[in-house]
Amino acid sequence: MKTAQEMRVNSVALIDGQPWLIQKAEFTKSGRNSAIVKMKLKNLLNGSKTETVYKADDKMEPVILERKEVNLSYISGEDYVFMDPEYNSYELRAEDLESVLPFIEEGMTDVCEAVFFEGKVISVDLPTTIVRQVVYTENAARGDTSGKVMKPAKLRNGTEIKVAEFVDIDDWIEIDTRDGSYKGRTQAPA
């Protein structure tokens, strides 16, 4: 057991029998009252978010989640099936993949990480940087070029992203999966 003050951002705590990711933790100590920790939490099972205040010495149980490398095997409607190197398959619904869904597409070769809680897969994490192909974009508006000019582009799976003005149809681009931002042009994956 750790105290609330010892828990760090991006660690996972077991609260009421469910794993919660600590997205933000702010320690505050006032002169008269005891120290407190304000936390922004995300439930890893259902995706709900909450903000809670704990006393700095409240006990919390840290959780170590198991992770395993997987690849997307196939998509069947709202079901996404991933397979590990031992050919075990793991099926997840679209709502379980909400944060990474815009970057998942049929036939992708990115090595992902399945996240397990108590032997059950609860989500999949993509690599920090992925490569995708632009299937549609328009010409950038000329004239307003005092800063970085961005224009909308559509990826193969229908996701729209802002890209640099020089990106054309069929170009391959790098995307940061943490915030969905365009990083630059690149070569097609081998």
Swiss-Prot record:
Involved pathway(s): Protein biosynthesis; polypeptide chain elongation
A molecular function GO annotation: translation elongation factor activity
Protein's cellular compartments: Cytoplasm
Keywords: Cytoplasm, Elongation factor, Protein biosynthesis
Predominant localisation class: cytoplasm
Function: Involved in peptide bond synthesis. Stimulates efficient translation and peptide-bond synthesis on native or reconstituted 70S ribosomes in vitro. Probably functions indirectly by altering the affinity of the ribosome for aminoacyl-tRNA, thus increasing their reactivity as acceptors for peptidyl transferase.
Protein name per UniProt: Elongation factor P
Gene responsible for this protein: efp
